[in-house]
């Protein structure tokens, strides 16, 4: 029986009305309702951003056929954004990859060959050969992996174990390096522990919201709906929005501030000065819970050492700091006067004062939100530190309705990249590879020889590009990310390395992305509810979901790929004799046996799954792999302020916010009565630091790595739009989302367009020192840049805006500044 949408809706209405009235139901309505009831519903977190909305997934006949907001989910309370409502369609693009593809010519691998279907065994044969050759000839530093904040928790954990323990290479980094690394380093420097102290429940209790470089209306729309409700329901609530261009979040703003790029550092120091000058310091909090330090300056821009800017820097890459007195700090910020700040930022004085008054008013609860405007910044760590200063000076932290809150852009940038520790320098639960004690903890838990994990920090994302280009990194596996489109400086620093004959590139992805098409081997990957998974969102909420359908064709999850590939290596092939001598019982064993099929991981039987429950990996291996990996991983954080609940609890709950102690989640960390790690009488305790005190840093304004000049006379900022997510590899395959925003445009001020003889709809060539792209002029619409700046989203594979961007990074976090480079326009 086929029905139109109208007939379907009408039949549902008839059935509902008849049931309410106690009447008999027409046959067609009964049939439709029966068909609807045949849909099986189960919970899952949304596949997109870091908000962590809960959805109900409807499956029927082996396919995801529907999706709705989960009314029991505390994050979104039944509401989805436009992307969330179309989640089912991301899985069924016409070009979905279903079998491995290898570049071949004359029946064998060839770097210049055509993509040819092969089997998984053939794919692993080629990978095994390339990995073993590189390891034998050049050692562990010649191989690398680029992962994702979209990995599930156990996928990231399995990948980290394989590289850091198995292959003894720390050259593994996630794409969260491009979005959250500055937040991580900022948290660690100020508090000694990563991730926000507050939660989304703050929204309903706050008096003021300040957005620093965050367009929440489009990038975190569900949270924005809660802020909007709070603002419109309470006339005394204030919203301030700071950005380098006007966007949709300004529609709600009481104080909408456009500032000159990079000058947010000036504004932050001005507010600190205002707080001090107006005696608005919370003296009791400040005296008990805060230390003051002066940070190193002139630290460079994370460019190659041969770059003139790096050569000129006095302290390139330095995160050093020294204690300072309050009087010295007061004198430091005193330089950032209202007059100087207005001049440097271009912001009117009255707007600056209004903003400062929000923080200084002891009766106003303030939340600071930020995302990429802060983090993708050559002084992103400093920006994070400076906003913490404002909350630490006023004591507006770790209490309901108050606090600094770093929002995340990916569904598990927190839960996987940060908490699991898939960065090149990290291990689980905030541990790091450079700390011998931390390495020892991991090696003992993993039952591997002491000294297995290298002490040297591996290559971060941008350094991986450079090493590939230089021929130092020769085998490179990327998963769950599209870095050829998303990463900076494609022309100069990425594409050359990927297409270098010395290098072999593997891309695991569900679709033929820009990255996949630039690779040598493509592995088809299972998506979202085609596997069992777990994500951790921005408020420390860990959420689980079960596999609900099977992947098409031969597509396999990232977890399956990692675990099965580990079977190809024996310990003698990857570890030196001195390590094997410490644990001779591991001789002859495969990395699969050493890392995954261990007594610790394999102790949970498949029988724990319901008889009809899908779980392809566990049923193939004969034990509950996901549970074993999670419980082993969770051990690292329990008792250390990162406590995760038992595995089974998450399948019953709509997520739990860590630390979870004695079955109770934590909404606000570091404060007495809210955090189980803060004892009675302590008030506040920032227990990531040895003395329990947070740090206020004195850090100055320093200019951007590249700014407009006479030839390249415009700032370029890049970012996202509501309808698409990151590089659009999923959302552009949803017809409705594609139609809503079919191609990227160049947002430009009308006067800048007029001065260049450009009109709305014209084609325009955007040119930087590194490359050029053709786009379309947009002088109206949702984004309205000031004169001197243009904005372009990066979702469009036909307009690779990252051909233009500079690979300058924050020297401390190694995160790229995608918000500031110089371009010129040429009419086409």
Curated annotation (Swiss-Prot):
Gene Ontology biological-process annotations: cellular respiration; Mo-molybdopterin cofactor biosynthetic process; nitrate assimilation
CDD domains linked: MopB_CT_Nitrate-R-NapA-like, MopB_Nitrate-R-NapA-like
EC number: 1.9.6.1
Cofactor note text: Binds 1 [4Fe-4S] cluster. Binds 1 molybdenum-bis(molybdopterin guanine dinucleotide) (Mo-bis-MGD) cofactor per subunit.
Post-translational note: Predicted to be exported by the Tat system. The position of the signal peptide cleavage has not been experimentally proven.
Residues reported to bind substrate: 794
Enzyme class: oxidoreductase
UniProt superkingdom: Bacteria
Signal peptide interval: 1-31
Keywords: 4Fe-4S, Electron transport, Iron, Iron-sulfur, Metal-binding, Molybdenum, Nitrate assimilation, Oxidoreductase, Periplasm, Signal, Transport
Co-factor requirement: [4Fe-4S] cluster; Mo-bis(molybdopterin guanine dinucleotide)
Keyword Iron-sulfur found: yes
Residues where [4Fe-4S] cluster binds: 46, 49, 53, 81
Chain sites annotated for binding Mo-bis(molybdopterin guanine dinucleotide): 83, 150, 175, 179, 212-219, 243-247, 262-264, 372, 376, 482, 508-509, 531, 558, 718-727, 802, 819
Any one Gene Ontology molecular-function term assigned to this protein's record: molybdenum ion binding
PROSITE patterns reported in the protein's UniProt record: 4FE4S_MOW_BIS_MGD, MOLYBDOPTERIN_PROK_1, TAT
4Fe-4S Mo/W bis-MGD-type domain ranges (all copies): 39-95
Entry's Gene Ontology cellular component terms: membrane; nitrate reductase complex; periplasmic space
Protein task: Catalytic subunit of the periplasmic nitrate reductase complex NapAB. Receives electrons from NapB and catalyzes the reduction of nitrate to nitrite.
NCBIfam families for the chain: NAPA, PRK13532.1, TAT_signal_seq
Subunit annotation: Component of the periplasmic nitrate reductase NapAB complex composed of NapA and NapB.
Family designation: Belongs to the prokaryotic molybdopterin-containing oxidoreductase family. NasA/NapA/NarB subfamily.
Protein name: Periplasmic nitrate reductase
Species assigned in the record: Escherichia coli O1:K1 / APEC
Name of encoding gene: napA
